């Protein structure tokens, strides 16, 4: 009888180690669903009125097409998510004043860093991110996510408007561990 009890106690560390391996596998699987290089697929202005920030006379809620049509240089708007942290590029439009008092709109990249946490609940895991600014991050499927955040942009009449913008990102390249 005492040998059986000794064997049972000797097996406890083995079973605990198995549970930890299972958690590590689950954590890795959850991170694997989101790891990669992403591009913005769409960005929708959620304000009351449509925007005409490029001054072409066509107001729209398609924030990303308005944003890309501004003639203010080019940019690479890729986002990177790895094991420990995430860099998400938020398209922002800024107003810059020249030395003579004139103003112009420029395209700007606003980098926000978040930290990836994998929450394990029962037999499933989900990815959560915490950002410096108020951002709603939602993992919507394998290799895609959405981000909603407030953006302030000037319109073509010089007024600033602030409203949420919902951006959808899709993975264009997988990043290994």
What are these regions (language model features)?
Residues 9-15:
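Hydrophobic helical h-region of N-terminal Sec-dependent signal peptides
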């Amino acid at each position: 009888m005492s040998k059986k009890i000794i064997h049972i106690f000797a097996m406890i560390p083995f079973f605990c180690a198995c549970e930890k391996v299972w958690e590590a596998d689950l954590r890795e699987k959850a991170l694997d669903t989101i790891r990669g290089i992403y591009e913005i697929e769409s960005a929708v202005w959620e304000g009351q009125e449509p925007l005409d920030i490029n001054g072409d006379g066509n107001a729209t809620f398609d924030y990303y097409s308005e944003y890309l049509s501004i003639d203010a240089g080019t940019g690479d708007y890729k986002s990177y998510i790895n094991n420990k942290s995430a860099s998400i590029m938020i398209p922002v439009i800024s107003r810059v004043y020249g030395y003579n008092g004139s103003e112009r709109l420029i395209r700007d990249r606003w980098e926000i860093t978040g930290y990836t946490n994998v929450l394990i609940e029962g037999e499933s895991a989900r990815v959560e991110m915490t950002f410096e600014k108020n951002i709603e991050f939602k993992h919507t499927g394998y290799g895609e996510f959405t981000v909603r955040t407030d953006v302030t942009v000037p319109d073509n009449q010089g007024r600033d408007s602030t409203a949420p913008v919902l951006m959808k990102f899709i993975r264009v390249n997988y990043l290994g561990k």
